[in-house]
A protein has these predicted regions:
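N-terminal secretory signal peptides that target proteins for export/translocation
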Residues: 1-14
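The canonical Cys-X-X-Cys-His
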Residues: 222-234
């Protein structure tokens, strides 16, 4: 199976693929013939787009933890529309592309809209939890949000794609987030290695569940704010009731794993 690091920012190859990705994200790729566009470059762009939207929405949940867990406040104002509007704004700021302008009839547009619908679905389903008055910690944390969005996305994508937020096995707290054999292999042999360029995704054309698939794994690293639950002292219980991992800032803390299934004619 062909495998590779997704191109980094340096070198002419990286610049060329970044141009292709930029064209796709801006919708200009529609003017490029399908035959002239590498399927892998298109899949890489779609995967990065999905990961970006998830991260942007999850950051809102992270930044509002104090409000969510405030027992004195009822309505937190974190409706599906508020969260999605903010996430779309951040996406546009980070990519230079308004997600609403991406052709909904394209594969990219379908999957990005499935991701946005999944975000809205999760927020709608958890309003009673978020807005519960008289309750402090509500367990609606970024990790839970990411898992729920991934589950909703897989259903809404209707067999075209899947997304899961996973991590090195020793860091996984929820069995639903455990890496599969492929993910565990790439984490252990690639992403945790000191030689792996920080933040660089890994991609591979392989088989998944008996189907041809392009798989992308986007590494994520602990920020200072993550260490409240995942830092030290190791073994001490955090607010969620799990023992802290003793991690340090910039350690590999998770991976956004995206599977894009190939139609038979695209193989």
């Amino acid at each position: 199976m062909a495998s590779k690091r997704l191109p980094g920012p340096g070198g002419w190859t990286g610049r060329l693929v970044n141009v292709l990705i930029g064209l796709l994200l801006m919708g200009i790729a529609a003017s490029v013939s399908v035959a002239a566009t590498e399927p892998a470059a298109e899949d890489a762009a779609i995967a990065q787009s999905l990961a970006e939207m998830l991260r942007d929405a999850r950051a809102i949940i992270s930044n509002n933890q104090a409000k969510i867990n405030d027992p004195e406040i009822g309505d937190k104002g974190l409706t599906a529309k508020v969260v999605l509007d903010q996430a779309m704004g951040t996406y546009k700021k980070n990519t230079g592309v308004d997600p609403a302008t991406i052709d909904p009839n394209s594969r990219h547009g379908r999957l990005l809209r499935a991701m946005m619908a999944a975000i809205a679905e999760v927020m709608d389903a958890n309003q009673s939890t978020i807005n519960a008055k008289g309750i402090g910690f509500k367990a609606f944390i970024p990790a839970v949000f990411g898992r729920l969005v991934g589950e909703s996305f897989a259903r809404l994508a209707n067999g075209e794609a899947e997304l899961k937020v996973t991590a090195p096995p020793e860091l996984v707290r929820n069995r639903k987030a455990r890496p599969d054999a492929f993910e565990e292999k790439i984490i252990k042999t690639k992403l945790v290695e000191a030689s792996w360029p920080r933040g660089q995704p890994y991609s591979e054309m392989t088989d998944a569940k008996g189907r041809a698939a392009y798989r992308v794994m986007v590494p994520e690293y602990y920020a200072a704010s993550c260490l409240t639950c995942h830092g030290g002292p190791k073994g001490e219980m955090d607010i969620t009731g799990y023992p802290k991992e003793g991690a340090s800032e910039n350690d590999l803390g998770g991976v956004i794993s995206i599977t894009l299934y190939r139609a038979p004619q695209a193989q």
